[in-house]
A protein has these predicted regions:
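Active-site hotspot residues in diverse enzymes, especially metal/ion-binding acidic/histidine motifs
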Residues: 1-360
Length: 360
């Protein structure tokens, strides 16, 4: 295996890289053994390497890199031992999500941050953005925070045509990739002095995409310190509802009556699920508790709680792909070199960070 004696793996990065692939140490050892031409690699060896009790360099570094499908320099980068500040990571997840899957998502988020930073540094992009923290309390509600942010970002009244474009224009980093779980739609992280990062699950239903993203936006602007998880989740939902469906504008569409047919009609206009529209109608007093529950029962009977009718295209981030395009056009890098900057093999890099204009 090709390696370099000048490179030494960072123990915490070995752990982060492994967890981003969803592997245990035994899984890692098995994959390394498969690639090592008959030489057995034990779980104990992987454990010692991740604990920093032995030096990983040269051919052994190359073996780790081949197994993990990252470049050797990627495994030598420094990062926080915990990957990301877990208390400042927010996500929309189901209660059924296991600890191993959640660790994988957190590790993927941290690795994605490193990859995006490498791409932006090469493109000399900087960290400018228009996000700020907005405090909420008994007087200033999540809905107030959403209204404030809409005004500051110059959004017109009514529905938002493209939420991804709005966030990227404000300086956010958005990446869509397969998070290997159906229990989580999105996760976000905003370290001090850096751009907010939103990682979106490519397997999440398209009609949940925008609400999940707006939910994470709410976390980012309102929750800069750890707090009560249940309360913060409710606040993020309230923020998302007002940000995507401002009360005055959506009331005009809901007051004529709310039934399944009306929800189907309004779904593409507001870019949210029928379920989200029904919740909004209830929160604004258009539907009583009994009417809301009856509507949910009807939706369940028709299978709409699993797959709703009326689909629309998922919004696609473009900023990082455009940076890759500029690296190719202005800095004369080919895609393989750009992938190496991000620490990825070409196929995975192209899938995550490239758009049609960047692969021509």
């Amino acid at each position: 295996m090709e390696g370099s004696d000048n490179l030494v793996a960072h123990p915490a990065m070995l752990t982060l890289a492994r967890e981003s692939r969803g592997w245990t140490q035994s899984d890692m050892a098995a994959e390394m053994t498969r690639l090592a031409d008959g030489e057995a690699v034990s779980q104990g060896y992987v454990s010692r390497a991740e604990a920093g009790r032995l030096v990983v360099k040269g051919d052994r570094l190359g073996l780790f890199a081949s197994a993990l499908r990252y470049t050797p320099p990627m495994l030598c980068r420094t990062t926080d031992s915990g990957g990301v500040g877990i208390g400042l990571v927010h996500h929309r997840k189901r209660a059924s999500m296991g600890a191993l899957s959640l660790r994988r998502v957190h590790a993927t988020l941290a690795v994605t941050r490193l990859q995006a930073e490498a791409i932006m540094t090469a493109g000399r992009e900087g960290d400018k953005h228009r996000f700020r923290h907005i405090a909420v309390d008994d007087l200033d509600t999540p809905a107030d925070a959403a209204e404030t942010l809409r005004l500051e970002w110059g959004l017109r009244a009514g529905s938002i045509a493209n939420l991804v474009e709005v966030l990227e224009a404000a300086g956010a980093l958005l990446v869509v990739r397969d998070l290997q779980t159906r229990d989580l739609d999105a996760v976000s992280h905003w370290p001090q002095g850096q751009r907010p990062l939103f990682l979106l699950n490519s397997t999440a239903p398209g009609d949940r995409f925008r609400f999940s993203l707006a939910h994470e936006l709410g976390h980012s602007v309102m929750h800069n310190v750890p707090g009560d998880a249940r309360s913060q989740e409710q606040q993020a939902d309230q923020f998302a509802a007002e940000f995507l469906m401002p009360h005055e504008a959506v009331l005009a569409d809901l007051q004529s009556g709310v039934d399944l047919r009306r929800l189907m009609e309004l779904k593409p206009k507001w870019g949210v699920s029928m379920a989200a529209l029904a919740r909004r109608a209830k929160s604004l007093g258009v539907l009583s508790d009994w009417q809301y529950r009856s509507l949910l029962v009807e939706m369940s009977a028709l299978g709409y709680r699993t797959i709703e009718p009326v689909t629309f295209e998922r919004e696609t981030p473009h900023y990082l792909a455009e940076v890759v395009t500029r690296l190719r056009q202005q800095h004369h890098l080919d895609l393989s070199q750009a992938a190496h900057l991000a620490g990825l093999e070409l196929e995975e890099f192209t899938e995550i960070y490239s758009c049609p204009s960047s692969v021509r």
